[in-house]
UniProtKB/Swiss-Prot annotation:
Family membership noted in the UniProt record: Belongs to the class-V pyridoxal-phosphate-dependent aminotransferase family. NifS/IscS subfamily.
Protein name: Cysteine desulfurase IscS 1
GO cellular component, one term: cytoplasm
Location of the active site: C321 (cysteine persulfide intermediate)
Encoding gene, per UniProt annotation: iscS1
Keyword entries, A-Z: 2Fe-2S, Cytoplasm, Iron, Iron-sulfur, Metal-binding, Pyridoxal phosphate, Transferase
Species for this entry: Archaeoglobus fulgidus (strain ATCC 49558 / DSM 4304 / JCM 9628 / NBRC 100126 / VC-16)
Record's miscellaneous remark: In Archaea the pyridoxal phosphate cofactor is not covalently bound to Lys but ligated by other amino acids.
Length: 382
């Protein structure tokens, strides 16, 4: 069954599962314990930390393990703002961030911080002039994702870093970009970077926040003081081992894989845009190699997804974290689409196990689905 919902979740690579298994049964020690079982657990955690740091060129900072990207984003925004509030209370956040950034930003507003949301153009690229105009003496934090999980647009993070020029901390959510494009904290100038295990075919329930040396955070989960006091709770050793193995594999394979996915992506886009009144969302060139986000006039994306599912093809209308709401995507609305346009969107995200045959099947089925749904729409007239 062709699966085109890799942005929502990915299967765990079998090599990762194999690496994890001994730490579920045989090597089950608590890394805080002062005996050989604990020492073994601590050793493999630090080994994984090193592999993940190497993947993002993170030698100039520390990897803090969390339960996932959502927690990492909360720690970055709330933890940094609360710790550095004496320096200022002005924060800039891109308007198309994942909700795990948007909602912490709104929480900060309730705590007395002034949060301004950075607008984007029709492709979802942030307005650099807005950042340049709005950054001021009391600005302490700017948060812009590396690439958008819904429309695939890659942001000019290096240019943003140059505009900030050390006047505020720069947080970058790289959850969607890791494993798809190069993620190098030094090249882009990030001070904090959010990443997730499952997005590189590791286990769910573990992520990390990379924190540059000298950046100070207030912990948001209190307890035994694990992870250098920034994230209490006994470390999830098997998951961290899996994260490390996934990072090791990604470091070796992402370039070749990205090229293969880009070829499949372009084939889908070229053929789908031949359908009458279909449009590409996101940047036509500066986009993730696995992302296809298209909209079709006169029909709803949810109907397309359900119809594809009946044909054995899995797809999405947008972020799985927000898919239970009937509201149009805040990302597409920020790009200037109307409600009805945003509701007519289909999101196809490719991954490691997609084949040319999967794409063949999609391109065989999708035009008929669109034609059938439009034939039932009172808005559509040939």
């Amino acid at each position: 069954m062709p699966y085109f919902d890799y942005a929502s979740t990915k299967p765990v690579d079998e090599r990762v599962v194999e690496a994890m298994l001994p730490y579920m049964t045989e090597h089950f020690g608590n890394p805080s314990s002062v005996h050989s079982y604990g020492f073994k657990a601590r050793e493999v955690i630090e080994e994984a930390r090193g592999k993940i740091s190497e993947l993002i060129n993170g030698g100039g900072g520390d990897i803090v393990f969390t339960s996932g990207a959502t927690e990492s984003n909360n720690l970055a925004l709330i933890g940094y703002a609360m710790r550095n509030a004496r320096k200022g209370k002005h924060v800039l956040v891109s308007s198309i961030e994942h909700m795990s950034v948007i909602n912490p930003a709104k929480y900060l507003q309730k705590q007395g911080f002034e949060v301004e949301f950075i607008p984007v153009d029709k492709y979802g690229t942030v307005d650099l002039e807005f950042i340049e105009e709005k950054i001021r003496e009391d600005t302490i934090l700017v948060s812009v994702q590396h690439a958008n999980n819904e429309i695939g647009t890659i942001q000019p993070i290096k240019e943003i870093s140059e505009i900030i020029n050390g006047r505020a901390a720069l947080h970058v959510d790289a959850t969607a970009s890791l494993g798809q494009i190069e993620v190098d904290v030094e090249k882009i100038g990030a001070d904090m970077l959010t990443i997730s295990s499952n997005d590189i075919y590791g286990p769910k329930g573990v992520g990390a926040l990379w924190v540059r040396q000298g950046v100070r955070l207030q912990p948001i989960i209190l307890g035994g003081g694990q992870e250098k006091g920034l994230r209490s709770g006994s470390e999830n050793v098997p998951a961290i081992v899996g994260f490390g193995k996934a990072a090791e594999i990604t470091a070796k394979e992402w370039g070749e894989e990205a090229g293969r996915l880009r070829r499949l992506r372009d084939r889908i886009i070229d053929n789908v845009l031949k359908i009458e009144e279909s449009y590409l969302n996101g940047h036509p060139e500066k986009r993730l190699p696995n992302n296809v986000n298209v909209r079709f006039s006169y029909i709803e994306g949810e109907s397309i997804v359900l119809s594809l599912d009946m044909a054995g093809i899995q797809a999405s209308t947008g972020s799985a974290c927000s898919s239970k709401t009937l509201q149009p995507s805040h990302v597409l609305m920020a790009c200037g689409l109307k409600h009805e346009e945003a509701h007519g969107t289909l999101l196809l995200t490719l991954g490691r196990y997609n084949t040319d045959e999967d794409v063949d099947r999609l391109l065989e089925v999708l035009p008929g689905v669109i034609e059938r749904l439009r034939s039932m729409s009172p808005l559509y007239r040939r």
